[in-house]
């Protein structure tokens, strides 16, 4: 806390020249994700101040005209003259790429992003940036246009405040798709940061509306509160999430975990507040410790051990069934790898997390035998189901001479084999499936009709999912496998299209299928492969003409446009089976004319809550959710 933070703390690595030419290299894209990344970069700097112990309040404001303001009460960016650059440190941080106080590890031991990179990239990709700094009893101001300072830092007077305010307007010539920020997208990330940093209050305010909208996050319980938030509305063990904290060799480890009454695991892992969606060595260490400790205690419990076959052990997926865990690691030099650079590669972290978690879990279970017994019983039940599923699969393979997940007989496959050019329609019922088969382009479009009883996977363990008469054909058709066997590179179609009727039953089937994809195949949603077909609600025919419309509003507008002509006929489609192959092709399957909705997972935490509410056991939260959201539904009752 006593180390001086001044201009000499700022290390400069290179200039800004390339940023405007190749912005995607610095912020990932110039679409909506890249636009929001500007905010994250600035907020990350505030979080770095908080992690260093100097900031406890961060405010993000969306102003009129797509202007963003981010304010913190940290030490303020240094404004004294930089020893090597000859201008103020503030100007260096805003105009030099890789200039910041993070590189010498003195001003900041740990940082969630590269301080200086973020601010300078925001400056390079904005029409203008204004910075106000409060430090050393004074207020300082500097403005930049397209990355260049308009004047040196100006001292504006005396102030007792402390901190930094950064305002900017993103450049629409860079962000051609949109420069409008999405409140909910920012809310998701800021809520996550507040959970991960329990000492900080984070406020998000939207002043673009007639009445300003504001949320404030403050979670003194930190990641323990995060786990409770993820598990709300569920029956849980233990009642209060188990919390583990410790450090070794400058690696700080925090874990909070709790089991719920479902069967899917919910693992959220972070390194320096960065969401490591692809996992990494920290997560490997946690999983290894949890499985080892569970098996160690099982050996000491002969009564429980008898419940699984001799020579069999609990495996990771048994022990993690129904587990919600948040793992947060903070390290000085993270090495990221993987497709999206969200996988931790530091080999030393695995052992540190493994030993710390193993030691603390052992101590906790020794002191809480009741909790241990409940967790072991759940894990054993999962192991029994897994072994039963394996035996059934092996028996089916011996009987048929092939893998029991061969392509289903009712699949009408397409002739092309390039997944990027192929799509599969998942259709409820043989009648709609028949129309779809007649109307499709057999070169690129496959049709999978579903039959039998649809399973609610929210209340079901994996062995039943794998052998359900409706879900097994989907798993076989997609080709990715499921669970530990999942491999996205084996997917056979890059468009998986759910096509169901527009009535209550169709909506229920869509929800059940989306629950299945979210719980067991979330990677294909994240890859952008899942879509909802939008069949028309009405066919309007008049004077040898016809028009298909997709909502009551479109119907009313069309009828008003047609006027009071005689012979206008309006047909309401109750189900897909009412359309013949040609009509289904023209309205719902023709890539040139069809309407589809891509299923996007922008907020996994909120998605988890919605699926748990809609498909879980507890009736009251479901009733409340339906009452609050009924206005948004489009159902034919």
Curated annotation (Swiss-Prot):
Cofactor binding note: Binds two Mg(2+) per subunit. The magnesium ions form salt bridges with both the protein and the DNA. Can also accept other divalent metal cations, such as Mn(2+) or Ca(2+).
Domain Toprim: 422-536
List of residues binding Mg(2+) 1: 428, 501
Required co-factors: Mg(2+); Mn(2+); Ca(2+)
Class of this enzyme: isomerase
Any Pfam family matching the protein: DNA_gyraseB
Described function: A type II topoisomerase that negatively supercoils closed circular double-stranded (ds) DNA in an ATP-dependent manner to modulate DNA topology and maintain chromosomes in an underwound state. Negative supercoiling favors strand separation, and DNA replication, transcription, recombination and repair, all of which involve strand separation. Also able to catalyze the interconversion of other topological isomers of dsDNA rings, including catenanes and knotted rings. Type II topoisomerases break and join 2 DNA strands simultaneously in an ATP-dependent manner.
Protein's recorded name: DNA gyrase subunit B
Organism annotation: Treponema pallidum (strain Nichols)
């Amino acid at each position: 806390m006593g180390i001086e933070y001044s201009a000499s703390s700022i290390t400069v690595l290179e200039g800004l020249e390339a940023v405007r030419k190749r912005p995607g290299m610095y912020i990932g894209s110039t679409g909506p994700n890249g636009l929001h990344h500007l905010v994250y970069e600035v907020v990350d700097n505030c979080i770095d101040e908080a992690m260093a112990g100097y900031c406890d309040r961060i405010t993000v404001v969306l102003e009129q005209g797509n202007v963003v303001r981010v304010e913190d009460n940290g030490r303020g960016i240094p404004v004294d003259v930089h020893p090597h650059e000859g201008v103020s440190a503030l100007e260096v941080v805003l105009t030099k790429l890789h200039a910041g106080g993070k590189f010498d590890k003195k001003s900041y031991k740990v940082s969630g992003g590269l301080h200086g990179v973020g601010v300078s990239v925001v400056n390079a990709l904005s029409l203008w940036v204004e910075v106000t700094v409060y430090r050393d009893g004074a207020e300082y101001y500097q403005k930049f246009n397209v990355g260049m300072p308009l004047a040196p830092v100006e001292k504006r007077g005396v102030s007792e405040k402390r901190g930094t305010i950064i305002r900017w307007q993103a450049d629409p010539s860079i962000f051609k798709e949109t420069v409008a920020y999405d409140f909910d997208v920012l809310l998701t990330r800021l809520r996550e940061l507040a959970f991960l940093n329990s000492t900080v209050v984070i406020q998000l305010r939207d002043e673009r509306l007639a009445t300003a909208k504001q949320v404030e996050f403050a979670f003194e319980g930190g990641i323990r509160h995060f786990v409770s938030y993820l598990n709300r509305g569920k029956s849980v063990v233990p009642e209060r999430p188990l919390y583990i904290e410790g450090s070794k060799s400058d690696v700080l480890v925090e874990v909070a975990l709790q089991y719920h009454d479902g069967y899917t695991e919910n693992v959220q892992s972070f390194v320096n507040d960065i969401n490591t969606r692809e996992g990494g060595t920290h997560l490997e260490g946690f999983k290894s410790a949890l499985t080892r400790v569970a098996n160690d205690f099982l050996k000491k419990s002969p009564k429980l051990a008898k419940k699984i076959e001799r020579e069999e052990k609990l495996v990771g997926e048994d022990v993690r069934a129904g587990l919600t865990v948040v793992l947060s690691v903070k390290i000085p030099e993270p090495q990221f790898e993987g497709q999206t650079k969200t996988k931790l590669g530091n080999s030393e972290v695995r052992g540190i997390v493994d030993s710390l978690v193993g030691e603390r879990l052992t101590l906790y279970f020794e002191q809480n035998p009741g909790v241990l017994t409940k967790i072991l019983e759940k894990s054993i039940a999962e192991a029994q189901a897994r072994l039963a599923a394996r035996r059934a699969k092996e028996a089916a393979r011996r009987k048929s001479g092939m893998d029991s997940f061969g392509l289903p007989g009712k699949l009408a496959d397409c002739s092309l084999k390039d997944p990027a050019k192929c799509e599969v329609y998942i259709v409820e019922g043989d009648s709609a499936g028949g129309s779809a088969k007649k109307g499709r382009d057999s070169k690129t479009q496959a049709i999978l009709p579903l039959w039998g009883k649809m399973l609610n996977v929210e209340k079901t363990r994996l062995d039943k999912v794998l052998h359900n008469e409706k879900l097994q054909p989907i798993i076989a058709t997609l080709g990715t496998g499921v669970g530990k066997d999942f491999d996205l590179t084996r997917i056979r179609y890059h468009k998986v299209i759910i096509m169901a009727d527009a009535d209550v039953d169709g909506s229920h089937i869509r929800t059940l299928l989306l629950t299945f994809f979210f719980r067991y195949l979330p990677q294909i949603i994240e890859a952008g492969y899942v879509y909802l077909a939008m069949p028309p609600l009405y066919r309007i025919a008049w004077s040898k003409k016809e028009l298909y419309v997709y909502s009551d509003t479109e119907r009313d507008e069309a009828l008003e446009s047609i006027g009071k002509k005689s012979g206008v006929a309006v047909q309401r489609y109750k189900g897909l089976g009412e359309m013949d192959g040609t009509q289904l092709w023209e309205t719902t399957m023709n890539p040139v004319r069809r309407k589809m909705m891509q299923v996007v997972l922008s907020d996994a935490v909120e998605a988890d809550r919605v699926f748990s509410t809609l498909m879980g056991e507890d009736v009251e939260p479901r009733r409340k959710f339906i009452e609050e959201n009924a206005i948004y539904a489009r159902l034919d009752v």
